[in-house]
Amino acid sequence: MCGRFLIDYEFRDLIDKYNLAKYQGSANRGEIFPSQKVMTIVQKYAIAMDWGFDFKWSNKKIINARAETIFEKKTFKNLARSKRCIIPASAYFEWQKKDDQKIKYKIFDHSESILSLAGLYHIRFDDENNKMYQFTILTKEAEEGIRNIHNRMPVIIEKDNTEEWLFSEKIDQLRLNDIINNQKLSFEAKIQ
Protein backbone atom coordinates (compact mmCIF):
# COMPACT_ATOMS: atom_id res chain seq x y z
CA MET A 1 0.00 0.00 0.00
CA CYS A 2 1.07 3.56 -0.52
CA GLY A 3 -0.70 5.89 1.90
CA ARG A 4 1.57 8.94 1.73
CA PHE A 5 4.30 10.31 -0.46
CA LEU A 6 6.64 13.30 -0.63
CA ILE A 7 6.95 16.11 -3.15
CA ASP A 8 10.04 18.27 -2.69
CA TYR A 9 10.96 19.06 -6.29
CA GLU A 10 10.26 22.25 -8.23
CA PHE A 11 7.56 22.24 -10.91
CA ARG A 12 10.11 23.24 -13.58
CA ASP A 13 11.82 19.88 -12.88
CA LEU A 14 8.67 18.14 -14.17
CA ILE A 15 8.70 20.18 -17.37
CA ASP A 16 12.24 18.99 -18.09
CA LYS A 17 11.83 15.37 -16.95
CA TYR A 18 8.58 14.69 -18.83
CA ASN A 19 9.01 17.15 -21.73
CA LEU A 20 5.69 18.76 -20.88
CA ALA A 21 3.72 20.90 -23.30
CA LYS A 22 1.26 22.38 -20.82
CA TYR A 23 0.11 22.34 -17.24
CA GLN A 24 -3.28 22.89 -15.66
CA GLY A 25 -4.08 23.88 -12.06
CA SER A 26 -2.00 24.16 -8.91
CA ALA A 27 -1.11 21.49 -6.40
CA ASN A 28 0.34 20.68 -2.99
CA ARG A 29 3.95 20.07 -2.01
CA GLY A 30 5.52 18.42 1.03
CA GLU A 31 4.08 15.27 2.56
CA ILE A 32 1.01 14.30 0.53
CA PHE A 33 -2.05 12.66 2.07
CA PRO A 34 -5.04 11.02 0.34
CA SER A 35 -7.60 13.54 -0.96
CA GLN A 36 -4.95 16.20 -1.57
CA LYS A 37 -4.45 17.72 -5.01
CA VAL A 38 -1.13 16.94 -6.74
CA MET A 39 0.31 17.34 -10.23
CA THR A 40 0.05 14.20 -12.32
CA ILE A 41 1.38 13.54 -15.81
CA VAL A 42 -1.08 12.58 -18.56
CA GLN A 43 0.73 12.23 -21.88
CA LYS A 44 2.47 15.63 -22.36
CA TYR A 45 0.40 17.51 -19.78
CA ALA A 46 0.62 18.10 -16.05
CA ILE A 47 -2.85 18.14 -14.51
CA ALA A 48 -3.73 18.79 -10.88
CA MET A 49 -5.74 15.82 -9.59
CA ASP A 50 -7.17 14.68 -6.26
CA TRP A 51 -5.66 11.53 -4.77
CA GLY A 52 -8.32 8.85 -4.44
CA PHE A 53 -11.34 7.72 -6.42
CA ASP A 54 -14.77 8.61 -5.02
CA PHE A 55 -17.32 6.05 -6.12
CA LYS A 56 -20.90 6.07 -4.89
CA TRP A 57 -20.70 2.36 -4.08
CA SER A 58 -17.63 2.78 -1.83
CA ASN A 59 -17.69 4.42 1.59
CA LYS A 60 -13.98 5.30 1.39
CA LYS A 61 -11.60 6.69 -1.21
CA ILE A 62 -9.75 4.17 -3.36
CA ILE A 63 -6.16 5.42 -3.13
CA ASN A 64 -4.39 2.27 -4.39
CA ALA A 65 -5.04 -0.46 -6.96
CA ARG A 66 -3.21 -3.78 -7.16
CA ALA A 67 -1.32 -3.82 -10.46
CA GLU A 68 -1.63 -7.60 -10.65
CA THR A 69 -5.41 -7.40 -11.07
CA ILE A 70 -6.26 -4.08 -12.77
CA PHE A 71 -7.11 -5.75 -16.08
CA GLU A 72 -9.52 -8.12 -14.29
CA LYS A 73 -11.34 -5.74 -11.95
CA LYS A 74 -14.42 -4.02 -13.32
CA THR A 75 -13.48 -0.80 -11.51
CA PHE A 76 -10.09 -0.52 -13.22
CA LYS A 77 -9.95 -2.48 -16.49
CA ASN A 78 -11.19 0.29 -18.81
CA LEU A 79 -9.03 2.88 -17.03
CA ALA A 80 -5.99 0.58 -17.38
CA ARG A 81 -6.40 0.63 -21.16
CA SER A 82 -6.84 4.36 -21.67
CA LYS A 83 -6.49 6.45 -18.50
CA ARG A 84 -2.95 5.86 -17.29
CA CYS A 85 -0.93 8.56 -15.58
CA ILE A 86 2.27 9.15 -13.66
CA ILE A 87 2.40 10.67 -10.21
CA PRO A 88 5.81 12.33 -9.73
CA ALA A 89 7.11 11.83 -6.17
CA SER A 90 10.42 12.41 -4.42
CA ALA A 91 9.83 9.49 -2.02
CA TYR A 92 7.04 7.56 -0.39
CA PHE A 93 6.35 6.57 3.19
CA GLU A 94 5.52 3.24 4.79
CA TRP A 95 5.04 2.18 8.38
CA GLN A 96 6.61 -0.94 9.83
CA LYS A 97 4.67 -2.63 12.60
CA LYS A 98 6.92 -3.64 15.51
CA ASP A 99 5.23 -4.96 18.60
CA ASP A 100 2.63 -2.30 19.41
CA GLN A 101 4.41 0.51 17.53
CA LYS A 102 4.43 1.78 13.97
CA ILE A 103 7.78 3.06 12.68
CA LYS A 104 7.62 5.52 9.77
CA TYR A 105 10.10 5.04 6.89
CA LYS A 106 10.89 7.34 4.00
CA ILE A 107 11.67 5.21 0.92
CA PHE A 108 13.53 6.72 -2.02
CA ASP A 109 16.19 6.12 -4.68
CA HIS A 110 19.40 8.20 -4.57
CA SER A 111 19.82 7.96 -8.35
CA GLU A 112 16.35 9.42 -9.11
CA SER A 113 15.24 12.74 -7.62
CA ILE A 114 11.75 12.20 -9.05
CA LEU A 115 10.13 8.77 -8.98
CA SER A 116 7.40 8.12 -11.56
CA LEU A 117 4.63 6.33 -9.67
CA ALA A 118 2.22 4.49 -11.96
CA GLY A 119 -1.39 5.51 -11.66
CA LEU A 120 -4.84 5.42 -13.20
CA TYR A 121 -7.14 8.40 -13.37
CA HIS A 122 -10.76 9.17 -14.07
CA ILE A 123 -12.88 12.25 -14.51
CA ARG A 124 -16.10 12.78 -12.64
CA PHE A 125 -18.46 15.69 -12.11
CA ASP A 126 -19.48 17.13 -8.77
CA ASP A 127 -22.99 18.28 -7.81
CA GLU A 128 -22.45 21.64 -9.57
CA ASN A 129 -21.27 19.83 -12.72
CA ASN A 130 -17.62 20.87 -12.23
CA LYS A 131 -15.06 18.52 -13.77
CA MET A 132 -12.93 16.69 -11.16
CA TYR A 133 -9.82 14.67 -11.93
CA GLN A 134 -8.96 11.86 -9.51
CA PHE A 135 -6.17 9.27 -9.46
CA THR A 136 -5.17 6.08 -7.72
CA ILE A 137 -1.62 4.69 -7.35
CA LEU A 138 -0.80 1.19 -8.60
CA THR A 139 0.94 -1.09 -6.12
CA LYS A 140 2.85 -4.36 -6.39
CA GLU A 141 4.60 -6.81 -4.11
CA ALA A 142 7.45 -5.02 -2.36
CA GLU A 143 11.03 -5.38 -3.58
CA GLU A 144 13.28 -7.54 -1.43
CA GLY A 145 14.90 -4.67 0.50
CA ILE A 146 11.52 -3.15 1.36
CA ARG A 147 9.56 -6.29 2.33
CA ASN A 148 10.68 -6.15 5.95
CA ILE A 149 8.95 -2.74 6.22
CA HIS A 150 5.77 -3.42 4.20
CA ASN A 151 4.60 -6.15 1.80
CA ARG A 152 3.41 -3.68 -0.91
CA MET A 153 4.98 -0.72 -2.70
CA PRO A 154 4.07 1.65 -5.54
CA VAL A 155 4.77 0.58 -9.12
CA ILE A 156 7.56 2.84 -10.40
CA ILE A 157 7.75 3.50 -14.14
CA GLU A 158 11.37 3.79 -15.23
CA LYS A 159 12.47 6.36 -17.80
CA ASP A 160 12.70 3.78 -20.63
CA ASN A 161 9.02 2.88 -20.13
CA THR A 162 7.53 6.34 -19.49
CA GLU A 163 6.32 7.06 -23.03
CA GLU A 164 4.90 3.58 -23.44
CA TRP A 165 3.03 3.85 -20.13
CA LEU A 166 1.57 7.26 -20.99
CA PHE A 167 0.81 6.78 -24.71
CA SER A 168 0.58 3.12 -25.75
CA GLU A 169 -2.77 1.52 -26.49
CA LYS A 170 -1.13 -1.90 -26.34
CA ILE A 171 -0.39 -2.23 -22.64
CA ASP A 172 -1.98 -5.35 -21.20
CA GLN A 173 -1.38 -7.37 -18.04
CA LEU A 174 1.60 -9.22 -19.54
CA ARG A 175 3.35 -6.00 -20.59
CA LEU A 176 2.59 -4.38 -17.25
CA ASN A 177 4.13 -7.41 -15.51
CA ASP A 178 7.29 -6.94 -17.64
CA ILE A 179 7.49 -3.28 -16.63
CA ILE A 180 6.97 -4.18 -12.96
CA ASN A 181 9.48 -7.03 -12.90
CA ASN A 182 12.31 -5.26 -14.72
CA GLN A 183 12.83 -2.34 -12.39
CA LYS A 184 16.47 -1.39 -11.89
CA LEU A 185 16.04 1.14 -9.11
CA SER A 186 17.71 0.56 -5.76
CA PHE A 187 15.64 1.80 -2.87
CA GLU A 188 16.84 3.12 0.44
CA ALA A 189 14.71 3.41 3.56
CA LYS A 190 15.32 5.82 6.43
CA ILE A 191 13.44 6.04 9.71
CA GLN A 192 11.64 9.38 9.99
Feature map (PLM): residue ranges:
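Short linear sequence motif anchored by a di-proline
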Residues: 1-192
